[in-house]
Amino acid sequence: MPDPATYRPAPGSIPVEPGVYRFRDPHGRVIYVGKAKSLRSRLNSYFADISGLAPRTRQMVMTASSVEWTVVGTEVEALQLEYNWIKEFDPRFNIRYRDDKSYPVLAVTLNEEYPRLKVYRGPRRKGVRYFGPYSHAWAIRETVDLLTRVFPARTCSNGVFKRHSQIDRPCLLGYIDKCSAPCVGRVSAEQHRQIVQDFCDFLAGKTDRLIREMEQQMTAAAEDLDFERAARLRDNIGAMRRAMEKQTVVLGDGTDADVVAFADDELEAAVQVFHVRGGRVRGQRGWVIEKSGEPGESTLEYLVEQFLTQFYGDQAELGGASDAGGDEASNPVPKQVLVPVLPETTDELETWLSQLRGSRVALRVPQRGDKRALAETVKRNAEGALNQHKLKRAGDFTARSAALQSIQENLGLQDAPLRIECIDISHVQGTDVVASLVVFEDGLPRKSDYRHFAIREAAGDGRSDDVASIAEVTRRRFHRHLRDMQEPGEMVAEGRSRRFAYPPNLFVVDGGAPQVNAAQAVLDDLGISDVAVIGLAKRLEEVWVPNLDGTAPDPIIFPRNSDGLYLLQRVRDEAHRFAISYHRSKRSKRMTASALDSVRGLGEHRRKALVTHFGSLARLKQATVEEITEVPGIGAATARAVLDALGIEAPPEPGAEAPPDSGAAAAVMGNDQSRVPG
């Protein structure tokens, strides 16, 4: 592997101007392309501290054997050159928004004498109008099948068209009136082209005019007593309305825009794009990409910039030869692109996109109204796509087996870790400190073995020590394991579960070297030597192993796209989720505790009944004993105890001896009353 010092540029030789650079491997292949406002500052960052780079970036620098750069005049030129080089060289270390398939579009061949409708994939061609993309080819066929009863345009291939012209007999679609049969002269070329033009107008959003014209024709046919034609027009209008229902209006102002949203984690990011034309969603696309791991290249701003550059660069190339005819629905670059955040290069991106479009393009972050609501919908789609991607990868048996084998090989374990346990600590400024323990067996969660822990020794009075908390939870978990192993007969007799009798093959803690060393020290004290311990740091691919001799070893680096790292990520995330849920529950219980908690015999159910009956504690304080006893399950004694707990003096029970001062007050009151004139 090349040494970066052998190809590092000489000091002062790198220009400070903006430009684009590329790293090459020993075989001369380009492995990474980047751009920078200052080439010197950016390139020096790759060589200043190799150990401080993200693992993926460090691997790139160690793989490369040379670096070269090109100075440009503006950042717009840098954007264009970066895109061209990524497209040309396909560097392995760059983020690429590759499709796992080619998305289909609906093509209308206006360049033919008798235009036809067809499903199409590939580069755009001159004289052809395109609608889409669609997520599935069947969605195009369904739309065409619905609309050809209204607009009976040709859908057959050139060979089929020629054959039916020779035999002078239309195909089945011609017989059922879903094709105007220009092949046998049922309509002229001009009439058929008008049918196709109306079809295109409908898909382009000019629906109101077409429906209004058909309604006028239907009314005229009815007045002429041509009820058969009126019924056919009525059915056609219904078919058009059903087609419109499939594309619900999402932006009432008829906006043409692409709405982009992201969902990401430490390793990957999912992006979704909704194509809105004429206020309706005309298409949708999605990708899941691997993140580089470099902090500056994992931000949402960077992901947005890279996506806009690559996606619209590719779209412009596909649409470069097409004849949009000024039609907004066919233009690959819309007037607006709605994004979650604006990158630093927003001005340059707008200029570049405007050049691709041929008119102004605006990047916007939706703040309110329909656009904001649609952006949230697209984001939910991105989150769902990322979750589905992760579940699909984790749920596959082959992938799970590969993940366990990957962990075994990378950690040097004797056997595959069939049982993995992970602990995580959760608290807010030292209060309500709790821990979770989750269990995965054969790569799948075993939720019946999950456990919560309330931290006792390492927390309290607003203090929290994560390292000590890790040690406490580890001690309690494995102390229970040893006890269950020593008392199997008693445990079975009492009917208790043997959940803690099974030790994990791999014990994972959330943290770095201090946390993992604390857990290992506890296992050593307990004499447990057959459990491997690791720690997961914030950089997920850095896996820490115990080292109790005081030195600071380098972490084990997992490949970012390995199945083993995916499984460890799922285990860590599940432990974090479980700890957070318990912490929130405990904090909520503490914060909502009231004076009613101290009333003996008043359980949670009756406390809720009291608050529900009176609406609030304030109204409960104003209630009398008799009013409180109206609540089911509350007696007079409990009602008095409730008032006492709320600081309200309750009247004495009937027959009880009144205090002396109370009696004197009553006598005075009686004397006063006796002197009131009758």
UniProtKB/Swiss-Prot annotation:
Keywords: Cytoplasm, DNA damage, DNA excision, DNA repair, Excision nuclease, SOS response
Listed transmembrane segments: none
Domain GIY-YIG positions: 16-95
GO cellular component, one term: cytoplasm
Major site of localization recorded for this protein: cytoplasm
GO BP term (any one): SOS response
Intrachain disulfide bonds: none
One Gene Ontology molecular-function label: excinuclease ABC activity
Position of the signal peptide: none
InterPro entries: GIY-YIG_endonuc (IPR000305), GIY-YIG_endonuc_sf (IPR035901), GIY-YIG_UvrC_Cho (IPR047296), Hlx-hairpin-Hlx_DNA-bd_motif (IPR003583), RuvA_2-like (IPR010994), UVR_dom (IPR001943), UVR_dom_sf (IPR036876), UvrABC_protein_C (IPR050066)
Disordered, as annotated region: 649-678
Biased segments, Low complexity type: 649-667
Location in or out of the cell: Cytoplasm
Domain UVR: 208-243
Family as reported in the entry's similarity comment: Belongs to the UvrC family.
Function: The UvrABC repair system catalyzes the recognition and processing of DNA lesions. UvrC both incises the 5' and 3' sides of the lesion. The N-terminal half is responsible for the 3' incision and the C-terminal half is responsible for the 5' incision.
Subunit note: Interacts with UvrB in an incision complex.
PANTHER family to which the protein is assigned, alphabetical: UVRABC SYSTEM PROTEIN C, UVRC/OXIDOREDUCTASE
Name of the featured protein: UvrABC system protein C
Organism: Mycolicibacterium gilvum (strain PYR-GCK) (Mycobacterium gilvum (strain PYR-GCK))
